[in-house]
């Protein structure tokens, strides 16, 4: 039995990517044969995943974990697999947040919502990042077992020493410095942080 993860993008610092990497590490430590496949692999993470288009054939005994967070044709390939299928639902941002801001992202989000609905009766089990996400899946017709499990956080990242260069640049500069960690996007409400 292999446990394979599929996700659209593996990117440094991304929460979904961190979750996939942490799951891989835990599964490996438990002795499972495990791999990650992604459509896009950021250069910093080359070697941590394989190209999704080169994914090996699965057997009935295998388990595929599909990280769902945006629209991609990968969802339809996942649907067709004959092994055990688990969807890890990371939520899809409501498309209206991107009106007049980023039409490409809005199209991917609308597509993601449609694919979420299409997968409703085609997965064996779901993990949702929150109770809200779980209820969202139920409202879309998911009847399979769904459990809530927050994303894994790479806690060792918090043990790293801060960049001396950055500290020197901002400490004692006479300003109040606000650090926002996340993508720049209307739904992240950077203006509320300020």
Model-derived segments and spans:
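Conserved donor-binding loops in enzymes that form glycosidic bonds
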Residues: 8-10, 69, 151, 177-185
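Donor nucleotide-sugar binding/catalytic pocket of nucleotide-sugar-dependent glycosyltransferases
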Residues: 117-164, 172
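Nucleotide-activated donor-dependent transferases that construct or modify glycoconjugates
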Residues: 1-12
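A short beta-strand-loop structural module common to alpha/beta enzyme folds
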Residues: 33-43
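Extended catalytic core of nucleotide-activated donor transferases of GT-like folds
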Residues: 44-122
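Short amphipathic alpha-helix
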Residues: 16-27
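Conserved donor-binding/catalytic core segment of Leloir-type glycosyltransferases
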Residues: 127, 168-188, 194
